[in-house]
UniProtKB/Swiss-Prot annotation:
Observed effect of gene inactivation: No visible phenotype. No defect in the positioning of ASI and ASH neuron cell bodies. No defect in the positioning of PQV, PVP, RMEV, HSN and AVK axons in the ventral nerve cord.
Domain of life, per lineage: Eukaryota
Glycan-linked positions: N43
Upper taxonomic lineage: Eukaryota, Metazoa, Ecdysozoa, Nematoda, Chromadorea
InterPro entries: Ig-like_dom, Ig-like_dom_sf, Ig-like_fold, Ig_sub2, IgSF_CEA-related
Primary residence: secreted
Protein name: Zwei Ig domain protein zig-7
SUPFAM superfamilies: Immunoglobulin
Signal sequence, renumbered to the chain: 1-21
Role noted for this protein: Probably not involved in maintaining the position of ASI and ASH head neuron cell bodies and ventral nerve cord axons of PVQ, PVP, RMEV, AVK and HSN neurons.
Every Ig-like C2-type domain range: 145-211
Keyword set, alphabetical order: Disulfide bond, Glycoprotein, Immunoglobulin domain, Secreted, Signal
Reported tissue expression: Expressed in body wall muscles.
Record's subcellular location: Secreted
Length: 239
C-alpha cells in the first residue's frame, strides 16, 4: 500500500511505500511552463521555458543516493531516461514544446536495487494551438493574453465553424461570448468540443465572437489556485 504525502504543492512531495516504510521519494512535484508566445501552428511550434523535474530518495529525512531514474509521461506512456547528479535524477527540459505539459511519474532505483516512484506535474496556462496555418495577431502586453483572428465572411444560409483550439494543463474550460455577452444555446448555433458552429447564416449571426479559455493552478508554496485565461476574438460578417 502506498500513500502520497505532499508537504508543499510547489516544492516537495513524498511518496510513502509501506512495504519499505523508511524510504520516501522527494521531488519538486510541480513546475510551471512559461510560453514564449500564445499561438502555435503545424509550421510554428509554440515553445515554453520549463524548469527541470527532479526526484530523489531519503530515509527518515536523510538523503539516499539513487543510481538510475526515469520519467514517464502519463498521457502517452513515453519514457524519458533521467540524468543522475549528486544522487538525484533530473529530467532536463528547458525550452520545449508546450505539449510536454502534463502529469509524469518518476521512478528511481536506489543502490540497494529497490525501485521507488512518485508523481509530478508540469502546469501550462492556456495557449492557442491551431491545426492549420492561420492569420492572427497577438495584442502586445495584454493581460489576459489576447489574440485577434482575421475577419470571417460567409454567405446567407452557409454553415461556419469558429475554432477555439485552446491547449493548457490542467485541462482548460472554454466559453463563448458574442458582442461582450455570454452566448447561450439556440437553434442557430451548436458546439463541437471547444468549437462554435453557426448554422444557416443570417444577419443575426453578425458580430464579434470571443472564446475564453481558462484554467487554474498554484504558483507558489501553499498558495491558492490562480486563474489563467486567454481571449481569442473573431469578427463575423454575413454577405
Amino acid at each position: 500500500m502506498k500513500l502520497i504525502n505532499c508537504i508543499s504543492i510547489a516544492l516537495l512531495c513524498t511518496l510513502v511505500d509501506f512495504s519499505s516504510a523508511e524510504i520516501t521519494v522527494i521531488s519538486n512535484l510541480a513546475v510551471v511552463g512559461s510560453p514564449e508566445s500564445h499561438v502555435g501552428t503545424p509550421n510554428k511550434t509554440l515553445y515554453a521555458n520549463i524548469q527541470n523535474l527532479w526526484c530523489g530518495a531519503q530515509n527518515l529525512g536523510e538523503h539516499i543516493d539513487v543510481e538510475y531514474g526515469e520519467f514517464t509521461r502519463l498521457s502517452d506512456g513515453k519514457v524519458f531516461k533521467g540524468t543522475v547528479n549528486q544522487g538525484k535524477v533530473y529530467l532536463e527540459i528547458g525550452k520545449a514544446s508546450v505539449k510536454v505539459a502534463g502529469r509524469y511519474r518518476c521512478e528511481v532505483r536506489t543502490l540497494d536495487k529497490e525501485i521507488h516512484s512518485g508523481n509530478l506535474i508540469i502546469y501550462m496556462p492556456p495557449v492557442l494551438d491551431f491545426p492549420a496555418a492561420v492569420r492572427v495577431s497577438e495584442v502586445l502586453n495584454a493581460r489576459p493574453p489576447h489574440v485577434i483572428g482575421a475577419e470571417r465572411r460567409g454567405l446567407h444560409g452557409e454553415r461556419m465553424v469558429l475554432e477555439c483550439p485552446v491547449l493548457a494543463n490542467p485541462e482548460p474550460m472554454v466559453r463563448w461570448e458574442k458582442n461582450g455577452e455570454p452566448l447561450g444555446n439556440s437553434d442557430s448555433i451548436e458546439y463541437d468540443g471547444n468549437n462554435l458552429i453557426l448554422n444557416s447564416l443570417t444577419e443575426d449571426h453578425i458580430g464579434k465572437y470571443r472564446c475564453i479559455g481558462d484554467n487554474s493552478f498554484p504558483l507558489f508554496v501553499d498558495g491558492p489556485a490562480i486563474p489563467h485565461q486567454i481571449y481569442f476574438d473573431q469578427d463575423i460578417k454575413v454577405l
